[in-house]
């Protein structure tokens, strides 16, 4: 019997191994939605966010695809980090360059 197919609406895969992608696919997961999150420390530069957003929109979709999963991401700056107004403005200004990525939820919704 084939498992029930499902979408995981909120999971942080950046901190997981590819074994988890494999297990999720075996269990019937077909798509993953990964929100950006606070890393446990405040990122100090917009470039740190750029690297993180690249990982969410380029690396994770490739890892997920190895097991037949689609990976989508939500890009944002966490409220805790947003206390630094200058950093917040820089991060928010860079987000549009990632919106065209097929792995970005905004792009997937407009298709």
Q: Where are each of the predicted segments found?
A:
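Mid-domain alpha/beta scaffold segments of enzyme catalytic cores
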Residues: 1-111
